[in-house]
């Protein structure tokens, strides 16, 4: 029968060391964090043979009191906390008092330290957890600690270390993160007496980013910032040019502590998805400042994870900060001149019609997916790109109206369900129309408050039945008609769902769906998502539901397929990801309903599409991240033709 033994102090110390000291990078992290806690302004790290032979950390901090030198190597000896309640208001990196004794248990440690009030410093040598000597020494204010022969008494641990190159890479990685988190401190890092990194104290982390990652990263990052009552989020995110296939260049700091957080990473990447190609991960350096009582840092031996009291708040603040910054950055790149939104500075565009209009205003639907609309516009004058379109006079409007025979009753009744309305399409020239899907739900006066996100464009034509070509001043534009229409519909559907304005239509024949017991339970738990999306359902039997009404915005999309698509997202992502589920749902619907590539558009349809795009909230990327519109300046084109250098 096996008996219970009490482990010796030496054995228990080695076991405890295994929790804190996994590899040389762990030692560097713990010692540099101690220097930061000591209010150091300059920290030097010197590594030899990937840290296996020697690790030396020097700082100019406040030092260790001479009488506390020995206590520093005792288990749970710390100056950071004294009561259990202090755990809920921690503002330092260390607090357990485990680092130094754990490191000393598996290596030879020489520490020298001096405080400002002392005439001389103290030196202590600890080998394998045992103190060899403590004596006075001459040294500068601050602390110098050398760790040699790491794992000399634990050969099994040393055997599992990676190659020297890999271990050095891990050390560099942790030093980079510590330098980013503490950009107000100067860092010097030497590997085998060769300078590897040097940063200078700066109030802006962007300067430290340049020192670590280089000029290319520095020139392609965008700042973001968001605040709430309990948390502030700020930092930098890279644009799509520097996105990568891995998450290696992502850094999260909570109260300056480098951590890994699935919640924060998901928030950033979901915000980034709308502006970049799929399967790419963004570069970002993100700081979260939060009251200590709202987090728990004592949930992981290496403190690499924290627990938030309310992860939903954190997710929302991070998502909003990143999404807003990316959206603003793309918008600013188009350099819209508010003084010349309507092309001609000499012409004041009047959104409100004359008090005594010459003709009654009509709305003619233009179906971008159905050629039925061709019969409505077939008699329109052909568009000539060589002719400049000026605002017509009233007599011209009357002539245009009188020249085309339109049965208003039939037009409105037969095509009243079409998506896009082209107001005064018969009589108006391009400068007379605001062709926007918002016209279905907002009156003309409201357009005065809607800001155009890019200049009014002069349409040149269509290329490959897929891309609309246009110009404005000295800039050439190309618009992907599918991506543009998809984003217009996405914004429209999103607004309807968010505002709970989704109109449902009764199905002629209810759709019956049989489910397993597990699936039916998922459905029951998340029935509100379906109701908010415009579905009206009822239980039709054991694990059977009947869809009585479906959202009108579905159009020709299969009701059953779309319902099951939402359901699969709920199962795969969990009901904690409601925002992502709704985003996927709306983007999928918009993609299916939008006009496709290889579809010929008339001038009026192209103009209508572009005008709709100008006035939506975020017009520059489709929901899947592809650009809707790209531009080339005259200068860029002339460079291509070698006209200029």
From Swiss-Prot:
Claim: DNA repair is one of the keywords in the record: yes
Gene Ontology MF terms in the entry: ATP binding; ATP hydrolysis activity; ATP-dependent DNA damage sensor activity; mismatched DNA binding
Keyword terms, alphabetized: DNA damage, DNA repair
UniProt keyword DNA damage present: yes
GO terms of biological process kind: mismatch repair
Record NCBIfam families: mutl (TIGR00585)
Functional summary from the UniProt entry: This protein is involved in the repair of mismatches in DNA. It is required for dam-dependent methyl-directed DNA mismatch repair. May act as a 'molecular matchmaker', a protein that promotes the formation of a stable complex between two or more DNA-binding proteins in an ATP-dependent manner without itself being part of a final effector complex.
PANTHER family (UniProt xref): DNA MISMATCH REPAIR PROTEIN MLH, PMS, MUTL (PTHR10073), DNA MISMATCH REPAIR PROTEIN MLH1 (PTHR10073:SF12)
Family statement drawn from the similarity comment of this UniProt entry: Belongs to the DNA mismatch repair MutL/HexB family.
Name of the protein in its database record: DNA mismatch repair protein MutL
Organism: Clostridium novyi (strain NT)
Organismal lineage: Bacteria, Bacillati, Bacillota, Clostridia, Eubacteriales
């Amino acid at each position: 029968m096996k008996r219970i033994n009490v482990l010796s102090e030496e054995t228990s110390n080695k076991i405890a060391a295994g929790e804190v000291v996994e590899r040389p990078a762990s030692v560097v992290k713990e010692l540099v964090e101690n220097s930061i806690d000591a209010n150091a302004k300059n920290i030097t790290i010197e590594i030899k043979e990937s840290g296996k032979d020697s690790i030396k950390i020097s700082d100019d901090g406040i030092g260790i009191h001479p009488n506390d030198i020995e206590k520093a190597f005792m288990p749970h000896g710390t100056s950071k906390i004294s009561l259990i309640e202090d755990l809920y208001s921690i503002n330092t990196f260390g607090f357990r008092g485990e680092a130094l004794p754990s490191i000393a248990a598996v290596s030879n440690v020489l520490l020298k330290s001096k405080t400002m009030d002392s005439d001389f410093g103290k030196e202590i040598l600890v080998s394998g957890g045992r103190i060899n000597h403590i004596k006075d020494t001459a040294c500068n204010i601050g602390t110098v600690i050398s760790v040699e022969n790491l794992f000399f008494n634990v050969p099994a641990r040393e055997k599992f270390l990676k190659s020297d190159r890999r271990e050095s890479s891990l050390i560099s990685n942790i030093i980079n993160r510590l330098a980013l988190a503490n950009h107000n401190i100067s860092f010097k890092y030497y590997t085998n007496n060769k300078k590897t990194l040097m940063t200078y104290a700066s109030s802006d982390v962007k300067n430290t980013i340049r020192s670590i990652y280089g000029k290319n990263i520095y020139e392609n990052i965008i700042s973001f910032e968001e605040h709430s009552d309990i948390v502030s989020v700020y930092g930098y995110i890279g644009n799509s040019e520097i996105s990568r296939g891995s998450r290696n260049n992502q850094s999260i700091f909570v109260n300056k502590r480098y951590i890994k957080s699935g919640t924060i990473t998901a928030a950033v990447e979901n915000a980034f998805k709308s502006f970049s190609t799929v399967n790419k991960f963004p570069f970002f350096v993100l700081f979260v400042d939060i009251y200590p009582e709202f987090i728990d840092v004592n949930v992981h031996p290496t403190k690499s994870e924290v627990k938030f009291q309310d992860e939903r708040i954190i997710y929302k603040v991070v998502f909003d900060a990143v999404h807003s910054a990316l959206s603003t950055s793309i918008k600013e790149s188009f350099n819209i001149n508010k003084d010349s939104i309507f092309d001609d500075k000499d012409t004041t565009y009047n959104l409100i019609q004359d008090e005594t209009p010459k003709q009654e205003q009509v709305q003619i639907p233009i179906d971008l997916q159905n050629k039925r609309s061709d019969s409505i516009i077939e008699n329109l004058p052909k568009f000539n790109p060589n002719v400049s379109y000026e605002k017509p006079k009233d007599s011209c409007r009357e002539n245009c109206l009188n020249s085309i025979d339109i049965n208003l009753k039939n037009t409105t009744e037969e095509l009243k369900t079409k998506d896009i309305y082209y107001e005064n399409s018969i009589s108006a020239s391009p400068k007379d129309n605001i062709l926007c899907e918002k016209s279905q739900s907002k009156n003309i006066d409201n357009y005065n408050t809607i800001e155009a996100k890019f200049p009014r464009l002069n349409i040149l034509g269509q290329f490959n039945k897929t891309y609309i070509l246009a110009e404005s001043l000295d800039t050439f534009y190309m618009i992907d008609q599918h991506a543009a229409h998809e984003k217009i519909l996405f914004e429209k559907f999103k607004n309807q769902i968010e505002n709970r304005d989704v109109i449902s239509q009764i199905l002629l024949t209810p759709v019956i769906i049989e489910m397993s017991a597990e699936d039916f339970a998922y459905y029951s738990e998340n029935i509100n998502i379906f109701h908010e999306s415009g579905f009206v359902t009822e239980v039709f039997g054991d694990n059977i539901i009947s869809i009585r009404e479906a959202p009108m915005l579905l159009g020709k999309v299969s009701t059953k397929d779309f319902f099951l698509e939402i359901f699969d997202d709920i199962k795969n992502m969990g009901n904690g990801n409601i925002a992502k589920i709704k985003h996927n749902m709306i983007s999928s619907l918009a993609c299916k309903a939008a006009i496709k590539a290889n579809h010929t558009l008339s001038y009026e349809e192209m103009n209508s599409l572009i005008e709709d795009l100008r006035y939506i909230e975020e017009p520059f990327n489709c929901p899947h991240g592809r650009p809707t519109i790209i531009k080339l300046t005259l200068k860029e084109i002339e460079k291509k033709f070698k006209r200029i250098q």
